[in-house]
Curated annotation (Swiss-Prot):
Known glycosylation sites: N110, N236
UniProt-listed Enzyme Commission number(s): 3.4.16.-
UniProt-listed GO biological process terms: proteolysis
PROSITE patterns (UniProt xref): CARBOXYPEPT_SER_HIS (PS00560), CARBOXYPEPT_SER_SER (PS00131)
PANTHER family: SERINE CARBOXYPEPTIDASE CTSA-1.2, SERINE PROTEASE FAMILY S10 SERINE CARBOXYPEPTIDASE
Keywords per UniProt: Carboxypeptidase, Glycoprotein, Hydrolase, Protease, Signal
Active site: S168, D377, H431
Record bears the keyword Hydrolase: yes
GO MF assignments: serine-type carboxypeptidase activity
Signal peptide: 1-21
Organism for this UniProt entry: Caenorhabditis elegans
UniProt-recorded name of the protein: Serine carboxypeptidase ctsa-1.2
The family this protein is said to belong to: Belongs to the peptidase S10 family.
Length: 454
């Protein structure tokens, strides 16, 4: 018995050491905070060659009972640290790139949030053997490994409600990870309750079909050209038109290609069509380039850069030597960048539609789900989200209606299966909803997590 107790004590002391060694005690340029935060690495992969960097902020309210969220930024190849410091995190980076200010609409006011830079090669995550080749299945598996490591490092959170959340290509990351969690519950049980996806690219074909219509209804497509395509390509039904199916070398295909070019290479800000395009940003200098998402025609994908957005403040902040030291980043690693071209180019996109995984989560495992879209985003437009959700075939329980935040219409919400599945649009927001409309973003995540009425 004495030996057993000694071993337990050693284990407990070892656990305390792991947590405290990852504790961020002084974050440069940040206001004084009332919550704990941690930064570290999880070693994952079949060869244990991938080191995934995480940044974990505890809830400002009651971390022992508040839900735990995982956040995954998309790309593929972009870092969640940008979201933490410019979207929903406890601080927003100032334009000086040296200091942070308190975010009054932070999601960690009553939720603890784990941000994972994934896959390896993104941000401060790296491969010990420099092999960062990966794809959807491997990323989901390694993210699951990181989650298991997280709950081993912080076992006090194993009983808390857990949600997987993300943005953009998170429309693939999130459902594939949720499926992996459900498939591996016998190996390591995770108390998952739901998933939330912001402006998620959840269907490649629907993304193409909806964007063509979205651009027309926003006054971007020439009327005479539209009428011609309507009759010659779509049998006078543009809503049901399979724009994605046309050959690239046909007249219909060339029209579809032209609309994609307009969205991504025509001078518009693809992340907020009514916002200015900031041509001074480092990423803009790469041009409004694109490649094929999911290896299919017509479907654009921003390279490992972020066109039209000025990411220099967050980049400058995360590359400060004292910030790197506070986060425990190895000095041998190169400078942080918001996105990785290497990941974006080499990533194996294995799935083009998330319908089956979402239905498995909702119907077979009773998980909650929310899809929310800024309504002026071109990258993953709101019409795609609406069509995807509606085509799940779930029982409609609340027809589309507006909701208000601070006395103003924040957007529109539709619910299915009671309130188990929610689709919400955010008025005037682009791709990064918490950046454009922080109060509305806080409202919808609170409604989702705590079953509050919209």
């Amino acid at each position: 018995m004495v030996m057993s107790r000694t071993l337990v004590l050693v284990a407990l002391l070892g656990f305390a050491y792991v947590c405290e060694s990852a504790l961020i005690t002084n974050l440069p340029g940040a206001p004084i905070s009332n919550f704990k935060q941690y930064s570290g690495y999880y070693n994952v992969g079949t060869k244990k060659n991938h080191m995934l960097h995480y940044w974990f902020v505890e809830s400002q309210s009651n971390p022992s009972t508040d839900p735990v969220l995982l956040w995954l930024t998309g790309g593929p190849g972009c870092s969640g640290l940008s979201a933490l410091l410019t979207e929903w995190g406890p601080w927003n980076v100032n334009t000086d790139g040296a200091t942070l200010r308190t975010n009054p609409y932070s999601w960690n006011k009553n939720a603890s949030i784990l941000t994972l830079e994934a896959p390896a090669g993104v941000g401060y995550s790296y491969a010990t053997d420099n092999n960062i080749a990966t794809g959807d299945d491997q990323t989901a598996s390694e993210n699951w490994e990181a989650l298991v490591a997280f709950f081993n490092e912080f076992p006090q959170y194993k009983g808390n409600d857990f949600y997987v959340t993300g943005e953009s290509y998170g429309g693939i990351y999130v459902p594939t990870l949720v499926q992996t969690i459900l498939d591996r519950q016998s190996q390591s049980h995770i108390n998952i309750k739901g998933l939330a996806i912001g402006n998620g690219c959840v269907s490649a074909n629907e993304g193409v079909d909806s964007l063509v219509n979205f651009l027309y209804h926003h006054g971007v497509v020439d009327q005479a050209k539209w009428e011609h395509m309507k009759t010659s390509c779509c049998h006078n039904d543009t809503d049901a038109c399979p724009w994605h199916s046309f050959s690239e070398f046909s007249a219909c295909g060339e029209f579809v290609e032209a609309t994609q070019q307009t969205a991504w290479n025509g001078g518009l800000n693809p992340y907020n069509m009514y916002a200015d395009c900031i041509s001074t940003s480092a990423s803009f200098r790469f041009g409004m380039e694109y490649e094929r998402r999911f290896n299919k025609k017509y479907t654009p994908e921003v390279l490992g850069t972020v066109p039209c957005l000025d990411e220099s403040p967050v980049t400058n902040y995360l590359n400060r030597q004292d910030v790197r030291k506070a986060l425990g980043i190895p000095s041998s690693l190169p400078a942080w960048s918001i996105c990785s071209n290497a990941i974006s180019y080499g990533y194996k996109r294995q799935y083009g539609d998330m319908t089956s995984r979402v239905l498995n989560a909702v119907n077979n495992n009773n998980l909650k789900m929310m899809l929310y879209n800024g309504d002026v985003d071109l990258a993953c437009n709101a019409l795609m989200g609406q069509r995807f959700t509606d085509k799940l075939g779930l029982t409609l329980s609340k027809k589309k209606t507006h909701f208000t935040v601070k006395g103003q219409i924040g957007g529109y919400v539709t619910q299915y299966k009671g309130s188990q599945v929610t689709f919400a649009t955010v008025r005037g927001a682009g791709h990064m909803v918490p950046t454009d409309k922080p109060a509305v973003a806080e409202h919808i995540i609170q409604s989702f997590l705590f079953n509050k009425a919209f």
